[in-house]
Amino acid sequence: MISPDKRYEADTNLYNPSEIEKKWQSIWTENNLYKTDELTENSDKFYALSMFPYPSGNLHMGHVRNYVITDLIARFQRFKGKSVLHPMGWDAFGLPAENAAIERGISPSVWTKKNISHMKSQLKLLGLSVDWDREFATCDENYYIWTQYLFLELYKSGLVYQKESEVNWDPIDNTVLANEQVDSEGKSWRSGAVVEKKLLKQWFLRITNYADELLKDLEKLDNWPERVKIMQDNWIGKSIGANINFNINTNPEKNITVFTTRPDTLFGVTYLAISVNHSLIKKITDQETIQDIENLKQYLKDNKNNELEKIGIKTSLIAINPVNSEPIPIWVASYVLDEYGTGAVMGVPAHDLRDFEFAKKNNIDIKQVIVKDKSEQSNELDNAYVENGYLINSNHYNGLANTIAKLKIAEEGVNNGWAENKIQYRLRDWLISRQRYWGCPIPIVNCKKCGAVPLNQSDLPVSLPKDIEISANKINALGNNNDWINTTCPKCGIGARKETDTMDTFMCSSWYFLRYPSSKCSTKPFEKNEINKWLPVDQYVGGVEHAILHLLYARFFTKALRDNELFDIDEPFKKLLTQGMVQSAAYKNNKTGKYVSPSDITDLSNPTDPIDNSKLEVLFEKMSKSKYNGIDPESVIKKYGADTARMFILFKAPPEKDLEWGDTDVEGQFRFLSRIWKLYINCAKNINSKSNSHPDKEKSLIKSMNIAIKEISNDILNNQFNTAISELMKFYNSLSNSINDINNNLKIDALKTFCILLAPFAPHIAEEIWHLIGFKKSVHLEHWPSFNAEALKEDSYELVIQVNGKVRDKVNINNDMSEDQIKELTLKRPNILKWTQDKEIRKIIIVKGKIMNIVV
């Protein structure tokens, strides 16, 4: 890299980040400093990736934290001699862009590209070491052609299918949502609307085919946060049990199947509960019961976001328990879900808390079949007994441990035809159909003769129409665009219609990390050999909110495409860091529930509402417009510089914890960089002048420098960036205190080392001060320093002296003392003579550097 023609020469010693940062960003771009090196057989690779952003139009502090963390890691690995791939792109399709475009009466394409341009310029202000040559947006036709290509690959392998299904319908965004996109309150993750149910013909991916592998391979992900793995484990929701068939007494040929993980409790079943939509409902003829069920359906619809009462409706239907032939009443219950298991569950009130509550409320028998101790008998229970124990009231299984009985009873059922061993998953197939314009078109043609026909890969891409109508509240759906929709069937050649649904945006983000290693490839989504070289991603950084959606889908895609022999990797992300939120002070009036802008508050140290003079509560919450607590990164960079923003973000809190914004802390980092600047300015003026050499100060500085190298290296590897900066500050203090009392060679070595250690954190000032002290090539092309273990050794150590195993004294010993010298020194000490005088010393054991034991 070429040094700038004219070095920045300040008239004063003041640190001027805006000029420094602008200059070096330009030079780095001109010199392609961060272009990815080609991988060779002898080079080590490191793939550093942030979850790519949705181009909303403006960078926020959450973005800054994400990308600065990844950039630090990428820079460090580059210093360590790795070939680093650190790309950036845009997750550009989706409802927010479409809705924003509708509001403004412009095309989503125009809106999105404008936002990308603005956000890219903001990102560049941070001085990221990104290889921008590999940039793409998922809405680019030369990207989504390959999303369509991969859809067809999955179709060929039987992982894509279409069916009519009751789906989650967002009435605000007018589109279907996957189960994962509906929150625990039954609301859309995007719009916040209460989700409705609707019957539509939809496209699905068979993610359930990979449920077991997705679950088992979580064990391979040693460098993922435990909470993310637990969230995926729970979402996949594997249950090992059995399907039990209960005959219906009025029709022995008809049975009801119930999934259970507790066959050991079958003798305690006192009722069966079915959902309001179970097929057996049709067998009910009593009009009053039918009306009660309809009322319950309405209640469930009206209260789907609230905690439900345990409502039960007893039917005239009776099931027969296969283990003892006892009749069991069938109830319709509010708590039984259609979508889990078979839509029917067995009620064991004595050994299930929910069933116990339901039975008590509806006067249903409670039969205890498990006790804690073999000697116990059944008693009236105050609550359900849910622990392990021994069977009672269970015929020939009495006395067996329930864990063994569980297997034995299931085995009996399998042998006699009334049970089937079953593994059940909570995970459901991935619904990918969306009824909106701004998404990747599905490469399917609907033919009256042939049905749904996949396009040939040579017919791709299916492009979005550009001549779209935008009204006050919607973009004209693809199905209403006759010029676009009409086509011919690729199978029979007659007139047909294109599929009018677009894909869920998670389809685009489930494989984007595979595109970067060969982003310019024009004949396929990616080069197999490049994927096998660069993948998995060595460090992935993003929010924990993507634990179930994006991260699970990306793992599924990777495994499915591997099985199509497109590459050889099993998991996409080797190491995952989920950064915490960036929070800022918000001022809330608890009387009105409204937030007040800090600009409207006269005294922030004692905030009151300017309208009613109420005292305001100060809360640190996630930055948002509605709470008036957003901090504009661009204004911070303009005032303090990107390096200060980076240092604050990295220093304020551990990366996985939430970070509270504080102007005082930002100013503290600016002052630290200013002190560094002043030190190097002064050193640059007399870099070659001789200093008075003080051996003690030199030795101390060498030790401080090597401690810094060791600790900062370990801290970065362990994602402890805040403590790394603390070590950097300690090294700076040692350097500044001794700079005039050390020999010139050590001075240059220490200044050089400090500069390299600073560079991943604050790359602009590090580059500038590097050149100020006379170096020509970029500091970012240097090698990371190695620490000298010898320099960390102490001159002396504390020796613990024992007599017959009891501590009697402690003494400082020089490292170079021999064992004889240690004995001579210690045996004369009064505290030792007190215990050894006039006694025979039988043995002396010395563990050098630690302990000495005298046996008398």
Swiss-Prot record:
Pfam families: Anticodon_1, tRNA-synt_1, tRNA-synt_1_2, tRNA-synt_1g. CDD domains: Anticodon_Ia_Leu_BEm, LeuRS_core. Signal peptide: none annotated. Keywords: Aminoacyl-tRNA synthetase, ATP-binding, Cytoplasm, Ligase, Nucleotide-binding, Protein biosynthesis. It comes from Prochlorococcus marinus (strain AS9601). One of its GO terms (molecular function) is aminoacyl-tRNA deacylase activity. It catalyses: tRNA(Leu) + L-leucine + ATP = L-leucyl-tRNA(Leu) + AMP + diphosphate. It is found in: Cytoplasm. This is Leucine--tRNA ligase. PANTHER family: LEUCINE--TRNA LIGASE, MITOCHONDRIAL (PTHR43740:SF2), LEUCYL-TRNA SYNTHETASE (PTHR43740). The keyword Nucleotide-binding applies. It comes from the Bacteria. One of its GO terms (biological process) is leucyl-tRNA aminoacylation. A motif ('KMSKS' region) lies at residues 622-626. GO terms for cellular component: cytosol.
